[in-house]
Every structure is written in C-alpha cells, then in structure tokens.
Amino acid sequence: MKNLTDSFVYLGHWPAAGSFGFNTDILATNPINLSVVFGVLIFFGKGVLNDLLDNRKQRILNTIRNSEELREGAIQQLENARARLRKVEAEADQFRVNGYSEIEREKLNLINSTSKTLKQLENYKNETILVEQQRTINQVRERIFQQALQGAIGTLNSCLSNELHLRTINANIGMFGTMKKITD
C-alpha cells in the first residue's frame, strides 16, 4: 500500500526542469493501467468494432452488388441501343436508297410529263397556226371574191343595158325551171 501512496506522491512531485531520468516505478508509469484500459476496450469494443466492420463490409458488398447489377443493366441498355442504332442505320440506308430511286423515278416522270406537255403544246400551236392560216385564207378568198364580184357587177352594169339584163335574167329563170322539171 505504501507503494501505492508513493506513486500518488510522485505524481504530485514534478522533477525540476532540465533533468531527465528513467522512472523504474511500474505503477508510476501506468503500463498496468494502460493494459487494463486496453484490455477493457478490446473486450467490450471487439463486438462493437466487429459490428461496425461487418456493417461496413455488408454496405461495401451491397454497393458492389448494386454496381454490378447497374453495370449489367447498362451493358444491356448499351447493347439494345447499339441494336436500335444498327436497325435505324439500316432503315436510313434503305430510305436513302429508296429516296434516290424515288427521286430518279420522279425525275423521269417529270421529264416524260414535261416532254408530253411540250408535244401537246406544239400540236396545239400547229393546229392554231393551221386554223389561223385557214381563216386568213378564207378571209382573203372572200375578199377577192367580193372584189371580183364587185368588179364583175361593175363590168356588167357598164356593159349591159337594162334590156340585156332582163333577157339574161329570163334565160336563167328558164334554165332553172327546166332543171326543176328534170329533177322532179
């Protein structure tokens, strides 16, 4: 017991500054106290520490498991996206090919339609020209006929007298009458 009280006395007494020494008193250096504290901490803290480590381990494993599931899901989505991309690219190529062939077909149809329309317009133009030529020719003929008729009437009026007119008219009426009898 005396050692115990001496250790308390030594705790209250500090060596003077500048001195350095080795303390051989085991109780004064507290290795026993420290070992008891460490033993208690290890004994009671072991379960808590194990629980903490187990919880941490489970969280890490769950995180890894979730990460793996997410990775697999992401890989599946990536594969699906790649498949859709290939499908869309194939459809785009098909549309492009169909579009080019459709454009060529429409171009040929437009060329053919335009050519046909131009031929029809050319025919209409030619027909219009022919009709106008015929109308002009008929007008010229009519004009010439009227001028010739007026000239003939003028000549007849100047050359023939009234008596000659009457005899010519009577002769013509007689011819018409004879022709009528023949036809009846």
From Swiss-Prot:
One of its GO terms (molecular function) is proton-transporting ATP synthase activity, rotational mechanism. Its main location: plastid. Pfam families: ATP-synt_B. The chain crosses the membrane at residues 27-49. It is a single-pass membrane protein. F(1)F(0) ATP synthase produces ATP from ADP in the presence of a proton or sodium gradient. F-type ATPases consist of two structural domains, F(1) containing the extramembraneous catalytic core and F(0) containing the membrane proton channel, linked together by a central stalk and a peripheral stalk. During catalysis, ATP synthesis in the catalytic domain of F(1) is coupled via a rotary mechanism of the central stalk subunits to proton translocation. Component of the F(0) channel, it forms part of the peripheral stalk, linking F(1) to F(0). PANTHER family: ATP SYNTHASE SUBUNIT B, CHLOROPLASTIC. In plastids the F-type ATPase is also known as CF(1)CF(0). Belongs to the ATPase B chain family. This is ATP synthase subunit b, chloroplastic. The lineage of its organism: Eukaryota, Viridiplantae, Streptophyta, Embryophyta, Tracheophyta.
